[in-house]
Amino acid sequence: MPPPPRLLFLLVMLLVVAAPGAPVFGANAPPEVKAEIDALLMFRSGLRDPYAAMSGWNASSPSAPCSWRGVACAAGTGRVVELALPKLRLSGAISPALSSLVYLEKLSLRSNSLSGTIPASLSRISSLRAVYLQYNSLSGPIPQSFLANLTNLQTFDVSGNLLSGPVPVSFPPSLKYLDLSSNAFSGTIPANVSASATSLQFLNLSFNRLRGTVPASLGTLQDLHYLWLDGNLLEGTIPSALSNCSALLHLSLQGNALRGILPPAVAAIPSLQILSVSRNRLTGAIPAAAFGGVGNSSLRIVQVGGNAFSQVDVPVSLGKDLQVVDLRANKLAGPFPSWLAGAGGLTVLDLSGNAFTGEVPPAVGQLTALQELRLGGNAFTGTVPAEIGRCGALQVLDLEDNRFSGEVPAALGGLRRLREVYLGGNSFSGQIPASLGNLSWLEALSTPGNRLTGDLPSELFVLGNLTFLDLSDNKLAGEIPPSIGNLAALQSLNLSGNSFSGRIPSNIGNLLNLRVLDLSGQKNLSGNLPAELFGLPQLQYVSLAGNSFSGDVPEGFSSLWSLRHLNLSVNSFTGSMPATYGYLPSLQVLSASHNRICGELPVELANCSNLTVLDLRSNQLTGPIPGDFARLGELEELDLSHNQLSRKIPPEISNCSSLVTLKLDDNHLGGEIPASLSNLSKLQTLDLSSNNLTGSIPASLAQIPGMLSLNVSQNELSGEIPAMLGSRFGTPSVFASNPNLCGPPLENECSAYRQHRRRQRLQRLALLIGVVAATVLLLVLFCCCCVYSLLRWRRRFIEKRDGVKKRRRSPGRGSGSSGTSTDSVSQPKLIMFNSRITYADTVEATRQFDEENVLSRGRHGLVFKACYNDGTVLAILRLPSTSSDGAVVIEEGSFRKEAESLGKVKHRNLTVLRGYYAGPPPDVRLLVYDYMPNGNLATLLQEASHQDGHILNWPMRHLIALGVSRGLAFLHQSGVVHGDVKPQNILFDADFEPHLSDFGLEPMVVTAGAAAAAAAASTSATTTVGSLGYVAPDAAAAGQATREGDVYSFGIVLLELLTGRRPGMFAGEDEDIVKWVKRQLQRGAVAELLEPGLLELDPESSEWEEFLLGIKVGLLCTAPDPLDRPAMGDVVFMLEGCRVGPDIPSSADPTSQPSPA
């Protein structure tokens, strides 16, 4: 039965009356409302709105602006009273038009990216009660009268901006909350704050640049609850007048330069709960009132650390609410303050960094609520009381750097909540208690610098939450147990300075979160390093120094892209230094001294642009010092001493402008000391002794301002020691054992040296005269022989003419050979970096560049297969000589320079230039590369599609993507932009290792016309900056190749590799491979993305997750905005993270994978 009409009418009316909906004006909105709409739209027009939060602000809406997001209106009038748009990443400036919102009461734009100044016109909105502009990038000063004009303002928060200038001096009486913290305000704190802001309850001026003193007038703010002035430059004393702030709850003055005492009256404010005056220069005694008791029973937290307090006034009683007592880093002495044991509710006690002595009393066990006990950096002695085991709530125990002795208390194993234990720098002995294995929440265990003995207890290796383990500098022995691999959360492992022996267990490869590994100074660790060590992707610090490791210098470290510190010193490593270490972009310290490393210094180390220390002393290195080391602009220490290096010191080394230490002593270096070394303005130590250096000492070395140590002894230097160097380094041993060197501080007088030089010149002159005389004599003899021969020939001619018979010479006697000798004019040779091949050999190997030998046609010319008589197979790129538009190859000198530069770009995933040829004929330009027998990725994907894709399983696709990303990342790191990343330019060697090709060739052709002619026959159309379907829209529009464009092209290749869909399969402007992938993900049709060879992936398996991660990496790389695309180094990191299981080796042949039945 339906309700009666009257009841329905009443219900409708009730709803209408009760609904507080916004007024509906439509086109009949009053002028003042239209003005507010215009002001809001003008405000919106000046902002960038990435979340489109204001997209619904439509002036034609009947309920505008009251229905707009972030806008609230007064009921009935429709006037805007609130504008709240927090946390929306809005950027731009705040429009002064907001001053038209005359009824605005609340303005909240906090946590955005707003910039510019605070509009002064906002001060005309007298109705404003609250302004929230914190956590933006606003700058400039606050106008002095700004706050005073806002007569109804109660809350003003602009913390976390870039505001500067002085703090305003006048405030409205209504102001209760003022937060100007974390800006750049300067000047002093206005003394008249209390005169105008009489109702102030919260005042935060922390983390600015305020100077001067704390105004005593702040003591008149009777309603003040919070006073925070931390992190400024305040001086003077703490005014006792602050004790008049009877409502004060929290006083924080940390991180200033306040002096004098802590006034007892301030500590005794009855309402005070938190007292923080740490990191100042306060002296005297800590007043008893600071610990609660009769004077102040409300105190909960007392922080007075980092001052110069020398004593503590012991309170008669302790506050019942006392929870935190921080007395660290003062000058307190005497025994442990046992009276603190009466604070039963104490949770944090920090006495570290003082001069307390004696034993820790058993009474510490009464602090049953204690969570943190920090006693480090004192002089406590004796044993740790077993009663500490009663502190069942303890989470942090710090006893470092004291004089504790005895065994580590087994009672610690009963403190099940312990997270951090620091026992280093004491004299603990005995074994590590097995009971520590009960601490299932333990995250950090540190016991360095004690006298602990025995093996590592197996119970330690069940601590699944342990992230930090430091047992260094003890007397622990035995082997490192394989169970160490159970510590899956471990990030830092330091076992250095012990007596462990045996090998590093392979289970260390399970520590995938490990960042620091220090096993140095064991002496008895030996054998080869486990390969699993090189699979720890987050490893940043490795020190294996001072052991007995052997074998070749491990090349596996080159796979650890995050590695910053590598120390292999004092071992028995042999072989050469791996060139692949030059591919470690983050490497800062490389030390491999005191080994048996031989061979030449790899020039690739110059690619480590962040390297600060290179220490390879005391090895068997030979050859020259690479001039490319000049690119190491951050290098501070270079020590190559005690090797067998030869040739000259490269003058380019002076480009290492950060060098502090340069040691090249005890080598076979020759030539002169480069005068350019004087450009090393930061150099402090220079040791060139025990070499074969010649010439004079450059006087400019004296211009190095901070040089403290110099040694050029035991060379073959000559001439006079520069006077400034002689007086600066007055020890004769600095210049000793140079027979031809003279002048102070040596005893060799330069006058005697000059006489010796004069005798040498006379001897040389006499020798020269002798040589000239002998030459003249030989010339006279030669002329006489010629005259004699001429006269004899004339006589024979006359005799023959007169008919005189002569005996005929017997055939062959005295006659020359009748045959013509072949002129062995050498054939023109290709400039090969590692072999000798002539141009004629290459013409024969390519059958005179026959079409049948063409491997590919690219935008830079034709690639020929060259099969040489000795079985060598190479790929020859022949650059076009001319084109339809008249473009020609660059002249020979420039071509050679570009080719030499390109030949230095080496990476395992790039096609490396092996040689070049620059004529004759004059228009021939050839580039020589390794032959890639397994074709390119485009062909491989096409074959995969014809065989249901089974020849390309997921691990192989991942390895291809990872290899290409590494090669492209190395190109970008070397300053090279590829410009045409596509499957046709990804080649495979005999081991199916991917190599990125066709890069760095643009400078070798004057214009693009020559490339265009050859590219016309390419399988995919090519633009000036890439290939259609792969080129980034922004790069195509700009007509210029960029790193961001390369990332986009790589993303397209990655999506094609994973899905099997070519970009050319999508027709029309509204569809491409990126949009297609996104649409499948939005539909949840992930199976549609799978290439046929990946259809057997189990959705519950890790490989399924890895595949999805790879898809997401591809979408990140193809972001529409170039600024949103990751760098290739980040792409490598993400792709390395895609494989959570073991990878197949990169040499695996994908065609050997059988197709499933």
From Swiss-Prot:
Residue ranges annotated for the Protein kinase domain, each copy included: 849-1144
Domain of life: Eukaryota
Name of the protein this chain belongs to: Probable inactive leucine-rich repeat receptor kinase XIAO
UniProt GO MF annotations: ATP binding; protein kinase activity
Residues spanning the signal sequence: 1-21
Segments annotated as LRR repeats: 101-125, 127-149, 150-172, 173-196, 198-220, 221-245, 247-269, 270-293, 296-319, 320-343, 344-367, 368-391, 393-414, 415-439, 440-463, 464-487, 489-511, 513-536, 537-559, 561-583, 584-608, 609-631, 632-656, 658-680, 681-704, 706-728
Name of the gene: XIAO
GO cellular component: plasma membrane
PANTHER family: LRR RECEPTOR-LIKE SERINE/THREONINE-PROTEIN KINASE-RELATED, PROTEIN KINASE DOMAIN-CONTAINING PROTEIN
